[in-house]
Amino acid sequence: MADFQSFTQEITGLGYVSSDNVFLFTHQQGPDVVFVPMGTMDHNIDSERYTIIIHEDVWKLRTHAVINRLKALTGQTRRVHGRACKIKRIDQKTAADFLENYHTGGYINTYYKYGIYFEQDLLAVALFAKCRTFQTT
């Protein structure tokens, strides 16, 4: 928990209050961030602002992805215009590596995999399943 508190205070400038082991971090321009330790319920969280709930297990497993997401939501990342980007088909390893490093949900196997590139940097991936035909009766 201490590493989460120090990150939010030093990097994003979020202040926090604690209640029943649930920590609420507030930011003037960004969303409220709620850190929920393992074994704690989050269903009683009431906020009038946009709220992000971060569970302790996600923080421990995918810290880098959570940090990047919080930085993006608090305006600490560089914006790139979509017209300056290129879309290319990517392989399974590239998609899996990117999602394991930068996405809190990780990777799932799909049929179509595309990368969004700015210059030589992979900024995002888009994954799509094969088209399915449903029979109606």
Annotated model-derived regions:
Residues 13-16, 49-50, 104:
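Short aromatic/hydrophobic-glycine micro-motifs
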Residues 26-44, 131-133:
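Short beta-strand-loop-alpha-helix junction that forms the active-site gateway
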Residues 65-137:
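A conserved beta-strand-loop-helix scaffold within acyl/acetyltransferase catalytic domains
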Residues 40-65:
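Catalytic cores of nucleic-acid endonucleases
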Residues 14-18, 35, 87-88:
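Generic structural motif
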Residues 1-19:
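Acidic-basic catalytic patches of nuclease active cores, encompassing PD-(D/E)XK
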